[in-house]
């Protein structure tokens, strides 16, 4: 069985390196897509992403959950990491997403094909995941990069949580960076000690050159949404936080490229509050720049 799994992973990597494989070319893509050995975060929660883009596997006896798919060219690496940990891609039943930009959603369609999982997303994110195209209201719509669309995308609608194999993941709506941004909270346990795990969406006020967070008709509630999202994350019970970009929660100050490190150092109930506070400082600077844009040299 193990031999067959190794062959399956090898074929995945070969597929990902063929000329026809989906891929996006951007200034940071190679850096983001550097390989990173998978590792256990805590209990049934594992890091299976690349060095620059997070993807998290949460396992249960009744099927697994995968959060985020990174770039299109990241999908073979993520699938390889799942198998390296001793799990099967075909046991992934649900794929979730933080937000629909190409560096977090680009690999979801391929991961769905490899697993047969359904994709569940916020109502405002579902269509972008189906089409691989951002809604015009997205602050980065003018600099978007298209990616393969997924099938069987199920909107969250009004559900406050989803359940897979006895695991409950609470929905934390965190719009602002995108209109449909979503963070997720669940519990993982080790030796009877259960911790609140949070996969945090981006809270940064990043956009194309024309968008204004202080007020823009394409997304008039962007400022209010982002501020409310910061408050929501700050108020979330949070023992371990994994950011959609791993360096945002200092993951690589703890783990090396081989996935070795002191997992206990990840446990920090102040992380969510600190992330929200840092995002607010960045947002205040962004709003100041919009009020007083730098003068263009003649």
Enumerate the predicted regions with their spans:
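Divalent metal-coordination and catalytic microenvironments
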Residues: 44, 58, 68, 99, ...
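Metallo-beta-lactamase
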Residues: 22-26, 34-36, 40-42, 91, ...
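Conserved beta-strand hairpin/beta-sheet module of binuclear metal-dependent hydrolase folds
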Residues: 31-85, 89, 183-205
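Bacterial N-terminal signal peptides that target proteins for export
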Residues: 1-8
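Accessory terminal helices/loops
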Residues: 22-31, 191-193, 205-298
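Active-site environment of divalent metal-dependent phosphoester hydrolases
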Residues: 36, 74, 100-106, 126-129, ...
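Bacterial N-terminal signal peptides
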Residues: 8-17
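Active-site HxH/HxHxD metal-binding segment of metal-dependent hydrolases
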Residues: 73-76, 83-161, 260-261, 265-268, ...
């Amino acid at each position: 069985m193990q031999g067959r799994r190794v062959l399956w992973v090898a074929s995945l990597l070969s597929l990902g390196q063929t000329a026809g494989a989906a891929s996006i070319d951007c200034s940071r893509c190679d850096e983001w897509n550097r390989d990173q050995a998978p590792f256990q975060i805590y209990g049934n929660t594992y890091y299976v992403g690349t060095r620059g883009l997070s993807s998290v596997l949460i396992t249960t006896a009744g099927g697994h959950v995968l959060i985020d798919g990174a770039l299109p060219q990241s999908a073979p690496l993520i699938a390889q990491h799942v198998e390296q940990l001793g799990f099967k891609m075909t046991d992934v039943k649900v794929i979730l997403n933080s937000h629909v930009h190409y560096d977090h959603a680009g690999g979801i369609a391929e991961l769905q094909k490899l697993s047969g999982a359904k994709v569940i997303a916020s109502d405002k994110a579902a269509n972008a995941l189906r089409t691989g195209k951002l809604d015009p209201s997205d602050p980065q719509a003018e600099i978007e990069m298209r990616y393969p669309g997924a099938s069987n995308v199920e909107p969250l609608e009004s559900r406050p949580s989803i359940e897979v194999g006895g695991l409950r993941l609470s929905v934390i709506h965190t719009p602002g960076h995108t209109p449909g941004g979503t963070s997720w909270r669940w519990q993982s346990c080790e030796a009877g000690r259960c911790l609140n795990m949070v996969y945090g969406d981006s809270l940064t006020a990043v956009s194309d050159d024309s968008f204004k967070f202080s007020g823009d008709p394409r997304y008039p509630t962007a400022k209010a949404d982002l501020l409310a999202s910061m408050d929501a994350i700050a108020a979330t019970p949070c023992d371990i936080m994994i950011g959609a970009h791993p360096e945002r929660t200092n993951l690589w100050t703890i783990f090396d490229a081989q996935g070795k490190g002191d997992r206990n150092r990840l446990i920090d109930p102040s992380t969510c509050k600190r992330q929200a506070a840092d995002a607010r400082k960045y947002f205040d600077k962004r709003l100041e720049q919009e009020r007083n844009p730098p003068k263009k040299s003649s």
